[in-house]
């Protein structure tokens, strides 16, 4: 959905509140004006044929519970950051294995960016197993809940390791797929490798 008076232009979904409609502030990931997006920036940035099809396929999802679901459209910053991260991950698998840092400010939708990234990574890297490791139990629970609410979009049900042994079990014999959540506290120095994958 788009709302516009040709001065202010915003996009959202049929379930978005007015406060959730967002401007698309770039044509090509270079930020031309971060205060207000121009009319042509919004339309050329979001409605290029190839990009629009990509947004419709990979950057709109349903989240929430079975009784309270809502449709979410990625913001421009999420779209370009995730696309760049996917290209970097593909390159990393062929070179040094270093994917880089994905940075967003507080409240900018990092959890959803991670969901979009995991969704695209499944295709880009031929069904990898993704281990999401955090440094806080509350963050682990928060991310696990967000990913679980997006299980249909991810085409798999995320798993949360309850212990080091449980994590080993979840990884053991797995040759593809899986999104597994854990905390770094389950590891100790000098410990043997949990999985050769």
Locations of the language-model features?
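Conserved motor-coupling elements within RecA-like helicase/translocase cores
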Residues: 162-180
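Phosphate/diphosphate-binding loops
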Residues: 1, 160-162
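ATP-dependent helicase/translocase motor core
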Residues: 1-129, 138, 142-154, 175-179, ...
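Short beta-strand-centered segment that lines the nucleotide-binding/catalytic pocket of NTP-utilizing
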Residues: 132-134
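SF2 helicase catalytic motif II
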Residues: 197
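Conserved ATPase-coupling elements of RecA-like P-loop NTPase cores
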Residues: 143, 190-193
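Short, solvent-exposed coil/turn elements at secondary-structure transition points
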Residues: 7, 162-164, 187
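Acidic/polar loop patches that form or flank catalytic/metal-binding clefts of enzymes
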Residues: 154-160
């Amino acid at each position: 959905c788009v709302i516009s008076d040709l001065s202010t232009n915003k996009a959202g979904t049929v379930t978005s509140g007015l406060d959730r409609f967002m401007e698309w502030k770039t044509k090509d990931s270079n930020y031309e004006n971060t205060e207000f997006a121009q009319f042509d920036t919004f339309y050329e940035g979001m409605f290029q044929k190839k990009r629009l099809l990509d947004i419709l396929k990979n950057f709109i999802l349903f989240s929430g519970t079975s009784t309270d679901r809502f449709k979410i459209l990625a913001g421009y910053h999420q779209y370009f950051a995730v696309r760049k991260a996917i290209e970097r991950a593909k390159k990393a698998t062929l070179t040094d294995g270093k994917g880089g840092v994905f940075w967003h400010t507080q409240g900018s939708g990092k959890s959803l960016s991670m969901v979009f990234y995991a969704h695209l990574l499944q295709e880009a890297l031929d069904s990898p197993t993704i281990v999401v490791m955090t440094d806080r139990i509350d963050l682990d629970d928060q991310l696990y809940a967000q990913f679980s609410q997006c299980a249909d979009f991810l085409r798999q049900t995320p798993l949360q390791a309850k212990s080091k042994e449980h994590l080993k079990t979840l990884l053991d014999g797995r040759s593809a797929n899986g999104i597994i959540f854990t905390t770094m506290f389950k590891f100790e120095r000098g410990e043997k490798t949990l999985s050769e994958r």
